[in-house]
Amino acid sequence: MPTGKRKGDVESTKFDLVLRPETITFENFRIGWFYTEARLVIKNPTKNRYTYKIKVTNNDMFDIRTPKGFIDPETSIEIELLHVPGILLPRNDVHHFSVYYIKCDTEAQNSHSIWTSKKSEGCKHVLIRFPNKIIRTQEMKKMEEDDMKQQKERNKLSNEKMGIRNQNMGEKK
């Protein structure tokens, strides 16, 4: 069973930032048909400034509005995460967002140069889930209706045959 983990993508035992929620759930009555939004809050409870980077296991299925940036001491930021429409929904807990950070000085302006020159100091995975109950699409509803019609026709034919047999049995008595 695929875990959605990248090679070398290992969670840190020590992670200085706080992530909420710990599991992202994309919920919308039109999930799969329209972009579905979820939010991740990153809180920095320390006295240090950090640069963060967020990755995901499938870039075709998910989008991150602000994948890199800075977080100042004792502040929080909210990151918008999106499920892209038109793609089948995967099983729960197969995919995840990975949040990385590096401590930086207060004057740092370019996070790209920090990420190219240093290695991540921490990594945490945020699992991705979808609602257990998915609203039926119009296509699914039509397929179900067609199946019901076919089943009724089969039952009708079967009943007619049984009726003929019952009539024949009645005549023999």
Curated annotation (Swiss-Prot):
This is Uncharacterized protein ZK688.12. Residues 141-173 are annotated as: Disordered. PROSITE patterns: MSP. Residues 141-163 have a biased composition (Basic and acidic residues). Coiled coil: none annotated. Residues 16-133 form the MSP domain. It comes from Caenorhabditis elegans. Gene3D superfamilies: Immunoglobulins.
